[in-house]
């Protein structure tokens, strides 16, 4: 699908001229595209470590697991901002989770793929909400489930080419672990809580799949990215969390080399990356599940540039800009999209440089090895502060995951494009907060009071950063009937001759609704049984027949059973 099966990796002697090889291959009539396997570097400094949360403060936030906002929750101002986290913070500039949690706090059927460094899968706030491949043994050389990836217990390390997710290599920053905590930290009363991490009881939070494309001090490649994105779609993820990008096409050349400036330029330059992302948005999910397709969410970039970075700039994806605790653009955030900024959403990303206070940054989960300083009281806390559109991005991914969790609870179905539109519409306008100037002190976190005092012209951001994502608005829109929402239906069943397929009706019926009877028009084609809302269909003769199932509400749904002979590795 999307032509990914047509791509081949070509290797040749290192002494051969790369451009000549590409030119010669492009002359072959069978070859449509020749693309270099470009090196991808992280868009952040791998030598810079996060500031840690000390143990005394950590002990003071033990109550953060409570469902309602507490005094201590002010440290997670991106989720619930009461205006007290730092001087100058303004109440309400958050993603408005607290009222949304009264309806839903997450669902384990929703999987978010974190395409990044490796996630610390055994962190005390993440372990219960990691996606787990039950057939696999972590890091094993055996592909126990036959999906083509050995040892992929929590995801896969596409840099090393094995299932060993790593997060303590020299150069690892804790980036992915920080991102994962914002989305799905367990509400267990130990540390922080994530936007869709559940209510603290088992099997209530969304799941994090670690798709590792960065490790240590090394770079990655477009090929690794494409493999990771396809893996996510094929293994159940419906949200792609991508806090990485190319450089902005409008970056100051003194800061870096400008990259793509248009959809056409990006599409023609990294064809494989684009096709992999299209594969995800069109083929993730389930036509009979909560979402048909997937949602790709990208960080806008941190280069102070008047253009967001690709791939996020592309209109098919959601691109996230960053806000500070006063609801103003973070000093570093890129802004403006070639699509007219229609795919932009703003979210809390932090801005310690504007407030001269690390608490204006985003607090989340961290490996101890990625926290700065030799003071073990701080570095062994397991929590730290980071700034960036990288931190804003998981706020949107978390709200999207919370929304899909609520849709699953209501047994509603969306096409991915419709749910993307729902997210883009579920925002609060920021234009009234974008006047005059904003001060910041560049690199205050590194150089302290020696940092130069600079100013931002806020009207330049008006209409160019998107609205602030609002979890309560997302859930309210899901309560409604707009954005293409459809009730989940009993799916058509395709089964091999003499094989059995099971349809879990609990995913389709509301709570406390049970199937009471079924009917198969031609019982010679399929044998059907019903037990505890599990509809089992066994193929007994090649052919097609209509069938129906009736539930305790008296509603009957018709579906079609198709029995075929399996050939080779699938249907022909």
Give names to the regions the model predicted.
Residues 237-244, 293, 405-500, 570-572:
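C-terminal subdomain of the subtilisin-like protease fold in secreted/lumenal serine endopeptidases
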Residues 483-572:
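Extracytoplasmic soluble-region selector
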């Amino acid at each position: 699908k999307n032509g990914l099966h047509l791509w081949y990796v070509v290797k040749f002697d290192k002494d051969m001229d790369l451009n000549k090889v590409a030119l010669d291959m492009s002359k072959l009539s069978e070859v449509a595209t020749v693309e270099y396997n470009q090196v991808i570097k992280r868009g952040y400094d791998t030598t810079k470590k996060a500031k840690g949360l000390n143990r005394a403060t950590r002990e003071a936030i033990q109550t953060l697991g409570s469902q309602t906002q507490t005094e201590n929750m002010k440290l997670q101002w991106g989720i619930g901002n009461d205006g007290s986290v730092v001087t100058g913070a303004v109440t309400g500039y958050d993603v408005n989770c607290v009222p949304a949690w009264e309806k839903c706090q997450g669902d384990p059927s929703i999987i978010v793929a974190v395409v990044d460094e490796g996630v610390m899968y055994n962190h005390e706030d993440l372990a219960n909400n990691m996606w787990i491949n039950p057939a696999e043994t972590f890091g094993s050389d055996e592909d126990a489930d036959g999906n083509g990836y050995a040892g992929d217990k929590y995801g896969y390390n596409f840099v090393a080419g094995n299932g060993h997710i790593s997060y303590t290599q020299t150069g690892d920053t804790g980036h992915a672990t920080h991102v994962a905590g914002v989305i799905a930290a367990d509400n267990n009363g130990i540390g922080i809580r994530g936007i869709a991490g559940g209510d603290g009881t088992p099997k209530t939070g969304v799941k994090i799949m670690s798709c590792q494309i960065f490790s240590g001090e090394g770079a990655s490649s477009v090929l690794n990215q494409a493999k990771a994105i396809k893996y996510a779609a094929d293994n159940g993820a419906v949200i792609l969390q991508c806090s990485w990008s190319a450089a902005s096409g409008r970056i100051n050349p003194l800061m870096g080399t400008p990259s793509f400036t248009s959809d056409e330029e990006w599409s023609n330059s990294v064809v494989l990356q684009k096709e992999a992302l299209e594969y995800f948005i069109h083929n993730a999910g389930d036509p009979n599940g909560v979402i048909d397709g997937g949602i790709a969410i990208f960080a806008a970039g941190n280069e102070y540039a008047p253009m967001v970075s690709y791939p996020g700039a592309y209109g098919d994806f959601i691109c996230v800009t960053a806000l500070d605790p006063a609801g103003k653009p973070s000093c570093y955030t890129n802004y403006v999209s070639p699509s007219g900024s229609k795919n932009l959403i703003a979210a809390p990303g932090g801005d310690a440089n504007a407030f001269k206070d690390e608490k204006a940054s985003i607090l989340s989960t961290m490996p101890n090895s990625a926290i700065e300083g030799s003071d073990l009281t701080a570095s062994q806390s397991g929590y730290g502060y980071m700034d960036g559109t990288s931190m804003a991005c998981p706020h949107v991914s978390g709200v999207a995951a919370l929304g899909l969790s609520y849709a699953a609870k209501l047994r509603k179905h969306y096409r991915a494009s419709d749910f993307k539109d729902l997210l883009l519409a579920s925002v609060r306008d920021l234009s009234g907060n974008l006047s005059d100037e904003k001060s910041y002190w560049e690199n205050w976190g590194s150089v302290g009071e020696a940092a130069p005092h600079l100013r931002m012209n806020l009207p330049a951001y008006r209409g160019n950063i998107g609205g602030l994502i609002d979890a309560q608005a997302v859930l309210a829109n899901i309560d409604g009937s707009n954005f293409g929402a459809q009730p989940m239906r009993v799916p058509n069943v395709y089964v091999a001759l003499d094989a059995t397929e099971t349809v879990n009706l609990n995913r389709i019926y509301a709570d406390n609704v049970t199937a009471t009877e079924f009917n198969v028009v031609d019982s010679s084609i399929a044998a059907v049984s019903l037990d505890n809302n599990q509809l089992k269909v066994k193929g007994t003769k090649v052919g097609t027949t209509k069938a129906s199932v009736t539930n305790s509400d008296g509603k009957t749904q018709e579906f079609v059973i198709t029995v075929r002979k399996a050939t080779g590795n699938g249907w022909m």
